[in-house]
Amino acid sequence: MKVWDMHCDTLAELRYAQQAGKPKSFLHNDLMMDLERMKQGDYLLQCMACFVHLEPEREKSPLLACLEEIDIFYRLLEQYPDDLMQVRTAADIQTLLTSGKRGMMLTVEEGGACLDSLGALRDLYRLGVRMMTLTWNFKNGLAEPNIVPGTDDMWPRPANTTGGLTEKGLEFVEEMQRLHMLVDVSHLSDAGIWDILRVAKRPFVASHSNARACCPHVRNLTDEMLTAMGEKGCLIGLNYCASFLDTNPDRSQVRSRITDMARHARYIMDKAGEDCLAFYTNIIGIDGDLEI
């Protein structure tokens, strides 16, 4: 079975290692994904997220950090031309199927990287970015998230049902859909998701979110969201992070177990339809006790 995984934070991890003076190889490394394991797992396509922090003490410039990760992406393509192929279009996927190579597609996790500039958004598209979240865990000029760093142990907690998309955020959604860049609602507030359901003219994705009825974490989607997204033909990606799978009230003991993955997967299919379920593992960017 060919694997298409639409979220990992490998580019950020490679950048952090490079900044620390301890660069890691993409061929084989101690992360959760490398080229050797892509081959072993029969990967067809891996979406490579440019993840950036908005905290000034973490990044001098979110846009510069994003561009540095895009540079790493292109250097990987240059380093492994016989093994890797960039995917920008549906036609590229058809070519990929007969190429014997592994595909990689650029995405962005944190719309704040654009610094509220539609021009920057279009430039990222020109560089190959084909999917972007409006937020990570920080409020930005586009929208508000459902959680903030340091509060993940506050579980369950009220969802953000009032802070949705800003006017600039609505402009971004319109431009992304014009460009055919996928809008990713993972990390977005409840209010923001409903804003997008109201204005979106094309299907969108929740790249790494589970079912809130199965685990009452605000990063997961409500029944009403699942149904509405199913009706719009959206994709909902199962997230393997233990915090979004396990209902153990002792949050220090949560585990990422296959039984919970299957429980969430079945529930999402029941509410949104089997064509809506995808496996966007978030396989790099999570920690904890992982069974898979």
Descriptions of predicted regions:
Residues 188, 209-211, 239-243:
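Histidine- and/or cysteine-centered catalytic micro-motif in compact active-site loops
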Residues 192-232:
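Aromatic-anchored, glycine/proline-accented short structural segments
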Residues 1-158, 216-292:
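N-terminal hydrophobic targeting/anchoring segments and the immediately downstream early-domain regions
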Residues 8-10, 187-190, 211, 285:
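Short, glycine/acidic-enriched loop or turn micro-motifs at the edges of active sites
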Residues 159-209:
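Loop-centered beta-sheet repeat module
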